[in-house]
Amino acid sequence: MKQQVLDCFAKLFGGEGDIRTYFAPGRVNLIGEHTDYNGGHVFPCALTIGTYMAARKREDRKLRFYSMNFEKLGVVESSLDEFQMGKEGNWTAYPKGMMWAFCQKGFPVEQGFDIVLYGNIPNGSGLSSSASVETVTGVMLRDMFGYDTISMIDIALYGQFSENNYNGVNCGIMDQFAIAMGKKDCAIFLDTSDLKYEYAPVKLEGARIVISCSNKKRGLGDSKYNERRSECETALAEIQKVKDIKSLGELTEEEFEAVKDAIKDPVRQKRAKHAVYENQRTVQAVAALKANDIAKFGELMNASHVSPVSYTHLRAH
């Protein structure tokens, strides 16, 4: 695939100069849904499919983007002087958002780029194609400008920062972290409250994880994602009036049941219950996987898939 992206780049922008290629994977979350913005645990892993990029630095501040996935859009032209927060209107919002984020974090992007992208992540499938674009852009910028002090965790945080502030999606850290820190044959057991993590080998003897497509398109920006997060934040504020906690992820199931009546709205109570119970399921699922108890791991995954429908009114994608 890399060669096809390079061939496309040469056809559009010429094959001369320092053209560099990059790749960032997609991700799937095995368990831990709607917990990352509630200070809980998640258990994602990177995929072999992802986003390929060919890029060449320019001498001016012009930006030229082309996606092999959106051929009808043609070459999208912009510049480093034309950041339009929340108003880009197409896929270039993600690489431009990362360029903006680098600038905001003290790492100037002072030269433009010619960029060709191709992703073999199905768009809107819930496998984090947008976070993959953000991450591959961050890796490219770090390399092109020699910003060696930027770590992969920094790139994940910059991706979340750009998603929150440039694209207006109040996402947690899971997608970008899983993509930036993914490791072959492992999932990442991540505590989103402090970013402590460990790699857990995924060795399923006699079993296989299958990612299936429901044919329901999903995009964080046009889903109920921001609304669900706001509901959880309000529920947390209500609980904090009776219990000293910083996030819903700190609560056990028993502790939640003891304080749940502090949440005045029954819908918000459902949202918070899911966050707390799902966090506990995630911890239990990782323990089951480590013990090679695949049946228990599967039971917890099934419960994880049911809970968002019952308590957050969201469907699997």
Residue locations for each model-derived region?
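Surface-exposed charge patches
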Residues: W100, L157, A287
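C-terminal nucleotide
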Residues: M1-R27, Y52-E88, C186-R315
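Short, well-structured alpha-helical segments that form the helix of a local strand-helix-strand
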Residues: I153-E163, F297-N302
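A general alpha-helical scaffold signature found inside nucleotide-binding enzyme cores
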Residues: T48, A93, D154-L157, E227-T234
